[in-house]
Amino acid sequence: SIGYFDQNGNVQNFNYKRYNIRSNVDTKINDFLSFEMNLAGRLEVRNQPGFSANPDDWNNIPQQAVRALPYVPEYYEIDGVTYPVSTRTNSSYVNPDAAATQTGNSNTRNTYLQTNAALRYDVPFVKGLCFKAMGSYDMMFQNARRIATPYYTAVLTLPVAGTTDLSYIRSADARGTTKSLTESAYYNYAITTNLSANYEGEFGKHSIKALALMETREVKSHTIGATGYGLDFLSLAELSKVTNKTGDGSEKIPSISGASSHTRAAGFVGRVNYAYAQKYLLELSCRYDGSYVFLNKSGNRWVALPGVSLGWNMHKEDWFDASWINELKLRASAGKTATQNGLNATYYMDLFTVAGNSLVLGGVNQGMVYASTIGNPNLTWAKVDSYDVGVDFNAWNGLLGIEFDVFYKYEYDILSSVTGSYSPSRGGYYYSYGNENKRDYRGFDFTITHNNYIGDLNYGAKLMFSYAYRRWLYYAGDSPNAPEYQKLTGKEVGSLYGYIADGLFQSESEIRHSAVMSDKAVVPGYIKYVDRNGDGQITYAQDMGYVAASAYPRVQYSLNLYANWKGFDIDMLWQGATGRTVSLTGEYSYAATGSYGIMDNTFLTKPFYHGGNSPLYLLENSWTPDNKSGEFPRPSITTVSSNNAFSSTFWYRDGSYLRLKTLQLGYTIPTKISKFMGMSSFRVYLQGSNLLTFSGLNKYHIDPEQPGVNNGYYPQQKVYQLGVKITF
């Protein structure tokens, strides 16, 4: 098969192309020996401007567009030169159009090759026994090239107090005034080998299946990159042509980077399945996995992972006479799994850092070496003990099907940073990482299906529902001296951290009789916070903590509806989630506490943030003396560390949603016509994705599936596809 895909982005000069080819070959050499090979290749080409649209990057292009002021002109002339106008007041280089068209270009080419070959031998003198050898080679090569061209904007400067004069000044791109060229190459390959023996046999009412397997995997990667500065001619954009000078003529040293990695893992698997009269089912399994990440001398390099499952097909019992029930099965399972849990192979080593001019000896600044990480040779796998009980039910030949499961998972030996977990008497010499974190995961899920035929009409539905609750049983980062509301232990995984809000201040009298932040101006219409420790003041150290809200949904569900009639078919998928909280505050500025990721306003919560535009709802629904029931605080253009800027329950919103994920309409021409045309089948279809979304976040223009609101994000797209599927 051959495929081609071409898509332009929502942002100008963004393009993605994909070319792919696949070939599968199955050959039967003789009655006992067969061979198969699968080959797949893919080329991806991404082109974009020199300025990023990555949602994790500050001032990315979508964010610039969202916060653009509508009243500034598109261009402005300064000293006879025309410049794009910054779309914010008193803020340089911010112009989404210029960022998309004048910042250079970035081209990334990813080439993938995936190969898989297998040889199977069916033992002629032992029925049901076969041996299989499989090998795969996967390769990925990336070549990236980025030309950064600086640009200037005309920035509207607000008048000085007491004047009415507006002026424009020329401002340089924050990336500097020097053209640069960055090139990088990345190579990765993975080799996997798999040797297995399978056996299937029946002896009267007894059925046995057995598997023995050995697998190895080796991965190597290498990357190298370089950036050169100073390009006299963009048409000669080569690293050999850079001048290594900045726009003012000073020297600019080029940067060179490189890294490589080599990993290995191996595993052994054994599994036995037994069934008696297909009524009573038993499965025993065990994995024995090893990884290079763990030290062999610690005894933790290898881990044994047993599992067992039981099943009872009750409907096959002789005494079971409910003929309308097609299936009634009870089952239970227990097992252990393990992961490396993001462990780095260097975590078992002591790491040292060289600090320059750290102390003075003899009147001279001296460098020093200190231990930045104390290695732990006893680090081990993160493990999960899983337990599940379920039932499968099917009746009336598919009119009603039910699958129901209740599960519990205990996760332990999770990688943790143990800094602060030991007393000062240790002098700071303790392991930097350990396997101390623990959490559990419990819930249930069910699936209900319905399928029916009425004449030429076939229709059906599938409802899926899942509830899961995860909590920290122990979190090593908790300080023993902290109040309970500042500890993660015992709280839900994904719990949000912030103040508890108690509405908005309505009067000066209320402010005087309430706990407030001593270093923040507070006026009527500002957020009122709960004094959690009761000391009469609001402080980050004492009153911020975890609240009963999680960024992860507890409930997820979907509904698939389908029907076909005389060649016409329709298929739709609805999906949604509830029990999730979304915060309108973000984490991309250096907050008042001097730490990232805890509190900050965004353009969704602060009018005219950083001199940019505001959503209309933020002003129309703000508190004013005439609108004291407003949803948002009193409008303010003070600094980001103002009273209202902190993460709090005031900014938390229900993240529940229901979305029409896909809708497909199709028609398959009659078989006799397709065969007359030399085809087995011919189908044409129209499909749409992300067509409708019902969510309380819609009014904030926030996609409920987005990971965060920090810097804006690339939006979910409505996609329409018209396709033809031909089978020969």
Tell me what each language-model feature is.
Residues 550-585:
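Glycine-rich, aromatic-lined ligand/substrate-binding cores of catalytic
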